[in-house]
A protein has these predicted regions:
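Short, Lys/Arg-rich nucleic-acid/phosphate-binding segment
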Residues: 115-127
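Short amphipathic alpha-helical interaction segments
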Residues: 91-108
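Winged-helix-like regulatory helical subdomains adjacent to P-loop NTPase cores
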Residues: 37-89
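A short, conserved structural fragment
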Residues: 106-117
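Amphipathic alpha-helical "lid/sensor" segments that cap RecA-like P-loop NTPase cores
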Residues: 6-59
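A cross-kingdom feature that marks ATP-driven nucleic-acid transaction machinery
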Residues: 126-299
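Conserved small/polar residues in nucleotide/adenosyl-binding loops
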Residues: 1-5
Length: 299
């Protein structure tokens, strides 16, 4: 999976490599290990002769006849619209038309249904997300840069508009990597229970402000691994950022764990960080908390 990358690269660059190719062997073979990850991204995506510059258009044209509708749907999902009614509303199509195209996109592996892991039968908690990371990267950055790339200024665009937000793009990729890692460890019983499924959770939590007033706010948990045999759960928070994880992030995950404890007892709280942890964690003594880094995923 994510480990099948360019061995010469650092683990951070390996992860980014996975994020822009989805781990597809064909695309990985085009990465030149003698060049930096930035040089490879520019060469493949941000030049008119780059192989991946036109790859998404070519693949969609081969698979779909209603290319305009499909393209609009994928653009909306890439921009963050993830429910049937919002996608249909944004592109001005009937929900049945959009659903038909979504089903085809799912069948060819470009889109998947994402469900809240503790409420998988709740249709209202279904989101559509891009499953293919190469498509996700392309749709997030290339369409708005086409004119600049065709003027031969793709490298400038990448340096100014893409590279500064590359870690942000990698956020959801890193979360998926961490879920996979958690499942692989969990099926061996490493967390004190036998993990049978992994996913994510989202919903609403009630927060008290400094005056004691209660307000509702949206909440999510990046990694939720469940043991339906033991009725236990492992939950995690993932940060692919240059900043270290601090006490506030720790407290948020601990608090949000209470949102699923009606059904499952929390066995472990796992933190995954690209850049490590603040000094506060040196004083933390809790055997139920695991502090991992990106390097942990590649061991």
């Amino acid at each position: 999976m994510y480990k099948r990358q360019v061995p010469e690269y650092s683990n951070e660059d390996k992860a980014i490599c996975y994020g822009i190719t989805g781990g597809v062997a064909k695309y990985l073979s085009m990465i030149d290990p003698r060049k930096s990850i930035d040089e490879n991204i520019i060469r493949l995506f941000f030049r008119t002769d780059g192989y991946l510059y036109d790859e998404t258009r070519n693949l969609l044209t081969q698979e779909f006849s209603d290319i305009a509708v499909v393209n609009n749907i994928v653009e909306q999902i890439a921009s963050g619209e993830n429910t049937l009614n919002t996608i249909a509303g944004k592109i001005g199509e009937k929900e049945q038309t959009v659903l038909y195209s979504l089903d085809k996109l799912i069948n060819v592996g470009l889109v998947e249904k994402k469900k809240c892991i503790t409420e998988e039968k709740n249709k209202k908690k279904t989101q559509y997300v891009l499953k293919d990371y190469m498509f996700k990267f392309w749709y997030e950055f290339i369409p708005k840069a086409t004119s600049v790339i065709e003027m031969g200024q793709g490298e400038v665009y990448y340096e100014r508009a893409v590279k500064p937000v590359l870690h942000s793009f990698m956020g959801s990729v890193f979360e998926e990597m961490c879920r996979y890692y958690t499942l692989m460890k969990g099926i061996t019983g490493e967390y004190g229970c036998f993990i049978t499924s992994v996913g994510t959770w989202w919903g609403v939590e009630n927060i008290a402000d400094k005056n004691g007033n209660i307000r509702a706010q949206s909440a999510d948990i990046d990694v939720v691994a469940l043991s339906d045999i033991d009725k236990r759960a492992v939950i995690g928070e993932c940060k692919f950022k240059n900043e270290k994880i601090d006490k506030g992030i720790y407290e948020t995950l601990i608090r949000r764990g209470s949102l699923i404890t009606a059904k499952y007892k929390i066995s472990k709280y796992i933190f995954f960080s690209l850049s490590g942890y603040t000094d506060w964690f040196e004083t933390l003594s809790d055997e139920n908390v695991l502090l991992l880094t990106l390097d942990s995923l590649y061991e």
